[in-house]
Amino acid sequence: MSERVFAELATIHYQKSLPCRHSFDPPRTTPILHLYIIHLLLPPLIAIVCLCYIAIVPFEEEEERMRMQVVETAAVEEEEAAAAMMSVYERVARMASGNAVVVFSASGCCMCHVVKRLLLGLGVGPAVYELDQLAAAADIQAALSQLLPPGQPPVPVVFVGGRLLGGVEKVMACHINGTLVPLLKQAGALWL
């Protein structure tokens, strides 16, 4: 090795050991300082994230409940007592004409959830009758099944303007081909 190369290597080694502003080495701080910073900043960040989650999630659920006019169980029971004399078909017709958009649903049904979310996304606040929470659910569901074409699932059943629109397949087909919004406007469920 020549003396010149050796001198250059010694100079580079010496310069690396000196503190330099243009160094590509990571800044030299003690690990204790990093732990202290993490110890100070992490709990407030976790608290902020938790508070945001706690504040936002119930707000979204409450907003959804406010937009969707869910028929309360007590009101439904009053209606059931008053409608005991009527036939099941008259009762379904009365329930279906009570609002611009009415959805007969089951609380655990994923397709019912899809239909309700679609209508809410369009800006419609449907009246929702959860059949699994009604006392006369079996009679109402039997009447709805006779109104639907054979092979259709019993829920969801959507009425627009007091007239039967259909189940989830019909609602989605109308949405895709662009006829759902005009139907909702004609029924008075949408103003825009």
From Swiss-Prot:
InterPro entries: GlrX-like_pln_2, Glutaredoxin, Thioredoxin-like_sf. It is found in: Cytoplasm; Nucleus. The lineage of its organism: Eukaryota, Viridiplantae, Streptophyta, Embryophyta, Tracheophyta. A motif (Responsive for interaction with TGA factors) lies at residues 189-192. Gene3D superfamilies: Glutaredoxin. This is Glutaredoxin-C9. GO terms for cellular component: cytoplasm; nucleus. Keywords: Cytoplasm, Disulfide bond, Electron transport, Nucleus, Redox-active center, Transport. Has a glutathione-disulfide oxidoreductase activity in the presence of NADPH and glutathione reductase. Reduces low molecular weight disulfides and proteins. It comes from the Eukaryota. Residues 89-191 form the Glutaredoxin domain. PANTHER family: GLUTAREDOXIN. Belongs to the glutaredoxin family. CC-type subfamily. SUPFAM superfamilies: Thioredoxin-like. Disulfide bonds join C109-C112. PROSITE patterns: GLUTAREDOXIN_2 (PS51354). Pfam families: Glutaredoxin.
